[in-house]
Amino acid sequence: MFLNVDTSIRIRAAPETVWDYAYKPENWTASNPHEHFGLYFDSPDNLPHAGVTFTQLESVAGIRAVLHGRIHYMDRPRLAFWTGTAAYRLLGGLLTVRLGEGGVLSLIERHDGIDMAHNVYIDFPDSLRGRLCLWFFEKFLNGRQAVYDHAFRELRYFKERLEEQRTKPPNE
């Protein structure tokens, strides 16, 4: 049972500029400082590449998680596809719920910039436990909105930073 969330934003910048800024782990972590606590790629340069695994420390809907994932495909500056397993710690870590997650990060060039989208999903098991987790996540944690807000904050941060750089005079 999938919870899918699609987010997108128009950014007035070249696709390469957006890609090169967003793919740096320090910028991704900064894009949502209240919910991102670190992103580490298992590569010599600590950057994402096709086939590279990663660990992201984060919080979604107020629940801390450790996401272990893999970048399956990258086509700079257009598309990246990732999947992983997030371990959500409930009740102070007494209960851990592991859920499959994934996403597609895409940049589509438009006449006035690019549309940057991050379409993410959480895969709740098709079992009684999975249905209970999904029900609780949506009913009590407003999970769908929390996931949307989480992803949209990332995109909005990139838009604000990159468009701010475009408007600064060259000597600043």
Predicted segments — roles?
Residues Y40-T96, R110, R153, E160-P169:
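Glycine-rich portal/gate segments that line the openings of hydrophobic small-molecule binding cavities
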Residues R89-D149, R153:
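Beta-strand/loop substructures that line and gate deep hydrophobic ligand-binding cavities in soluble
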Residues M1-L3, I63, R98-L99:
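Residue-level preference for beta-strand/loop junctions
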Residues R10-R12, L57, I108-R110, N119-P125, ...:
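Solvent-exposed residues in well-ordered beta-strands and their adjoining turns
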Residues T17-A22, W28, F54-Q56, I71, ...:
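Hydrophobic pocket/interface hotspot
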